[in-house]
Each structure stands twice: as structure tokens, then as C-alpha cells.
Amino acid sequence: MMIDRRTFTMSLLAAAAASACSSPALRPGASDPLPAFDPERGYQRREVSAGGRTVVVRAWEGLAYVSRPVEPQWQVMNLYIPEAYFQGGQIEGRTARTAPIFLPNSIGGYMPAKPGTPEGRTGPPPASGQTQPPSAIAVALTRGLVVASPGARGRTLQAADGTWTGKAPAALVDLKAAVRFLRHHDAVMPGDTERIISNGTSAGGALSALLGASGNTPELQAELQAVGAAPGRDDIFAVSAYCPITNLENADAAYEWQFGHVRDYRRIEMSMLDDQVQRREVAGTLTADQIALADALKASFPAYLNTLDLRDAAGRPLRLDAHGHGSFLDHVKSLVIASAQQALDAGADLSSRRWLRIASGRVVDLDFDAYVLAATRMKLPPAFDGVALDTGENQLFGSSRLDKRHFTAFSMQHSRVVGAQQADERTVRMMNPMHYIGRSAATVAPHWRIRHGTMDRDTSLAV
């Protein structure tokens, strides 16, 4: 079953009656109680402002959402609930029973993530020349949404005994546990647990998509039980994802299909400093060996794409020839053209975009290669499964005893690391939202909103 993600819609302001979930209890087969939640204790009152509006909220920060955390510092959430809902009040027509629950994560590069706050940024970074907008958390609160922002384990975490504790699928397990925590305490917590809206950017967008695609899947039940997650459902109402990194098994080929002709790069190196993700830009030019890898990956993409039997909204096949041209490329171009037309209609000056052809106020064509060249390459080939085991995704797919592993046959075959290992198929599969869509064992979120920046280089427009 193929789903056209761009046809999914999402309403952040939807409302519906809440359904009560189980009251606090012991997890079956365990003696440790699930984390408690008391709406009258453990919070601080604060004012949150955005867009000229101010709302008083109750803030619970550092709230554990599992009973046996592997990393207690990270497996916590920040919960913000408008005070009006404890007084029988309303915000924009929403009440304690009908307010949607906004679930933004702060995950970047599959690194460990702290819970978000009203003061911090939880959306995509602003475009060049634009000012930083208010945080999505602050905006959501002033519009009457309940906000639950979970922290999550990440790829760099290591226990004192040397065990790696944040490898795949740890972050997905944590987000699911957070959803279960909310449902577990639904009877005493304002907010509609049937209207949970996940949000994230880049790797966080990937995790948001994974959360929405894998609802209630039995594949992760053992991992959820191991950390002491609440029993019950973990499906959600809607997904909001900015430039999500998806379909990692095929993302290397997709990246070179788009960026293969771009030889210069500006890549981002990520590290952790004082529990904060640090980013540093590094510029350079591809070597001959890297170009050879790029060419091989680019050549492999059409065959994969054609196996998917993709079709546009009118039912027409979307395919590529051996050179990477065809109706699929035309379709991708049409999406960029439509976006440019929308910006033009809104008054944007696009005269500097030499790769656009504009006539009589209409965007009539796009030089795709020139457009991609203007965007520039961000990642070295292979973009995700590095042959030197040097990418964040290599570290993501490590194991409890091994820091980094390959996760594609191509990079394993071309590996530059003696003794390199390849991740098991199950782990790789669990981190691909496409695996769950169309399967009866998973409850897929009914509403999706996926956005990808015109000049975003984190992944290919194809995936």
C-alpha cells in the first residue's frame, strides 16, 4: 500500500471528547509502580507569551514517564497545562476535555534530547535573514493546547560499564512510552489523549513520523516493557514533521540521485557539549573515490524507485529511466514550482533564483540541476551509511556493545573499516516508517503534515 504523504492533512486546532484510560497501577508482571502524576502537586505556575497573547500555565518539568529508566536524565518530559483548564475555563473554545495535546521533541541528529521548554526553539530554524519566531511550545500553549515535550535517549549515550544505551530503537521507544504515560493518567490530566500531535525536525521529524506510523506495533513491546512503560496504546492523532530523515536503507541512493552532480559540499559536524548539541560547518570538495561512490549510488536509484509503483494524484505512473530522468523527476519539479508560485503570489522577490523561469507572474519552469547546485551538497557519499562508519546514522545503528555499524549492503561492501559489522535487519526495519504503513499490526496516524525546505539539504526530496 502506497500513501502519498503530501495528500495527508492535519489540524492542530482539532478538538474532540477525551476517553479515560487506566488509573495509576502496577505494570503487569512487575513490582515497580508506574510514575505518578498529581495535578495538584509538583508544578510551578508561570506566564507564557507568544503572538501578543499571554497564558498562565502549570509546569511540571523533569517528569519521569517510565518506571525503570535506563537514562533517568533523559527519559523525562516537560508538561505544560493552561491554568484555565483547572478552573473550568476555556481557551479559544477548548476545555480540559477537548484540548489537543502537542507532543514536540527536540531530537537533532539522533543525539540525546532534553525536553523542550516555552523559551526554546522546537521547530525548524529560521531561513536566512529571518528572525527567530516564538517557540512552537509557547504558541501552542497560548492557543489552548496542552504541551507534553518528552526527552529521549540518543546515539552517544554510554553507561558506566561501557554499554551503549541510546542506540536504535531507543528514541522511538521513549516517545512511545511518553504517549503511554499521557494515556495512563488521562483520567486526572487535562487534554484529549485522542488528539495527540507529534512534532519534530530532521531526525526529530523522522522520529515524529515513526511514532505516527508505528502506533501499537507489537514489534517494540519487549523494549517498552524493559524500561517500565505504561501498558496500553501508543498510537497518535497527527504527525507534524519538518524535513524528516526517512527510508534510511535507500536514502543514500536517493541523495545521490539529487545531489550526485554537486562536487563541492558544506557539511555539518555535530557533537555534544554540556548536554547541548553543537553544530560546526565544514566545507570541501569530493575526492575521486567519493565521486565514484556517488556515481554508483546514483545509478542504483532508478531501479529501486521503479519497484515502488508510485503514482501521482491522477493515477499516472511516476518512473525514472536509467539516467534518473522521467515522470518522477517531473513530479518533484512540479512540487518545487508550486511552492515557488505560492511564494511569488505572496509577494516574495524571486528574481535572484536564476534556476527559476518566471513569465507574466507565473513560475513556468525549473532548471533542476541548477536548483540543486544552488542549494549545495551537505553530505558526503554515502550520505547516511558512511563507508568509514563516520555518520550519525552509523552510530544510531550501533548495538549495546558496538558503537557504530553499517546498515546497508552497499556500504558494508565498500567499508573502509576492518572488522566492520552490519546492523540486523529487524533494527533497521524498525527505524523506517515505510515499514509500518499498510500493515494491520500498526495503527497509523490519520493526519500528517510534512514540510521540506526548498533549500534543505539534509536528505533528498525523493524520500
Language model feature labels by segment:
Residues R97-G108:
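Short beta-strand element of the alpha/beta-hydrolase
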